[in-house]
Amino acid sequence: MSVFSSFNLNQCMKQTFLEEKMCLKLLNSIPLINYDEHTRRYSFNPMFDGFILQVLDEMPVDEVTKITLRAADTNLDDGNYFEAMKLYSHSKEYRKIYQHNIDFIDIYPYVIKQNKDVFTDIANHYWDIEKEGHYEFSLIICFSLLMFNEKHMVETLLTDITSDICKDSVLSDNKKNSYMAEIQFIKAFTEYNDFGKMREGFNIILSISKSPVNIIAGGFPFNYECPSIMMLYHRQSGALDKELETLEQCAPDYYRITNGHGKGFEALMRADVLYNRGDLDGAEILCQKAIYMADSRNQYAIYIAAYYILANIALYRGFNDQYKENMHKIEAVARRDTRKSKSLEKLSDICYACMYSDIEQQDKIAAWIKDQKKIEDSVNFFSLSFVNIVFGKYLILNREYHHFLGISGQLLGLNNLFSYILPQIYTYIYLAIANKETGETIKAHKFLKEAIKLAEPDRIYMPFVHNYSSISELMAETVIGHDNQGFIRNVIKISKGYEKGVKSIKKAGHALADYGLTVREADVAKLASQRFSNKEIAEQLFIAESTVKSNMKVIFNKLQINSRAELKNFFE
């Protein structure tokens, strides 16, 4: 069983050929085997790993290979596809994985840096396997490599896959056309993130097949683990309106060829643009439109990103109840889609981290977002620049200026790789702050000018507004051309309202803490004070009714009250 990273009882029975009773007896008798009651899965204690490796080293190679392949087959049958991929790769056996029907939706969460070697190894053995009419997994591997930015290898694979499909006598003409449409979809994504060129690629699909592509599309969130469509597709300073127009023009055809993948992305992009320009009312309207569109196709990542902008708007206005409600919805939606839960949970963590950094509660940020190596090992390559913005803000808030300065070159390089403008603006702002705080005033002015130079042509104010308290003196000191004065005046104007909103939200949070209640307990208490039943509270907060009951007991104890009626005194 040691070849499994974790396993359930059924897998144990298959792998060992033992009956349930004997498996349980053995599992329960070994202290170094851990059991997770929530997932009902077993795993070996890390202390046991060294011993296990020694045992395996002393066994005949053929026997170890046989055990590993049996475990791979078990994982494949049980739908644990990435676990199967790892074991097949380790055993140098690739036929079954290439010929199996696997959904990309089950593979996408594992397309992260720490797993790159597995994907690359399997891709390198494409040429060794007879496909026998099965090319789904080959295309999945192709798109996965594209997400590792391995464009050269992807182009080589696509050329040979195209040739093999054309020569495959097993396939009907209709099936060949279907595969060709899928190949064209991947080719379009080789032009990421130039949506103009991507659009040209998508339009070719309409002439190849009348059916929607379905092997890749729908298997990954349109916005990956990034809550900002604008971050992904704004790539040229001064061209934001043109880029937005291109997305809006392409959306109907993209939805047609993908059966609604990313539905609502063009409304969300415009909402993002308007928010960054300080047009909160316009952004709010378009967020509601994006939510409606995304909900019609279960596009949860778009849904979450829309609520993220709404949470930012509520923060600006100082509307604490709306702010908390939008944040709760982000968390609830992330739990809704269980098959994609890993990527959606990451997206939720990233949204929360952004909001916590805005109200200077950086200690509440998820642990993995505070660790640069874990970020690089956990986040899709296309989303990495956005998470680096959050990590950079975390370092600035904690006054780790030298740490940020040390990694800034790497961050700028990654931003340039995809021509990401928004992360570049934030990085320059953080560089200005870090240099100012370390006594390098001339450099600070230089980097602030660079940030303004990128942002001013498209009227992107919010990165400066979010950091205004740290850069206000620099902005006043920096010598900027006459053309930029209007831009700076708008930043100052928007910042006044933003700082009031942040103070209001922070004050509300402190008031709850003064009662001795956690945020969750305060939410429950407030609804209870309004005479909502436990069931109604559970539905509104997306928690179990039993959780509400246990919270109410704690609330009564902390506030030293005996009835719900007394709660009104605390929330008037």
Predicted regions and their residues:
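Amphipathic alpha-helical segments of tetratricopeptide repeats
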Residues: M85, I105-D106, A123-W127, T159-S172, ...
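Linker/hinge segments immediately adjacent to helix-turn-helix/homeobox DNA-binding domains
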Residues: V390-L397, H402-I421, Y430-I433, E437-V519, ...
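Extended alpha-helical scaffolding segments used for macromolecular assembly and cargo binding
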Residues: Q54-F137, I141-S144, M153
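C-terminal boundary/linker of central alpha/beta nucleotide-binding cores
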Residues: M1-D57, K66-L69
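Helix-turn-helix DNA-binding segment
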Residues: K503-K553, N557-E572
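Internal alpha-solenoid helical repeat scaffolds
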Residues: I129-A305
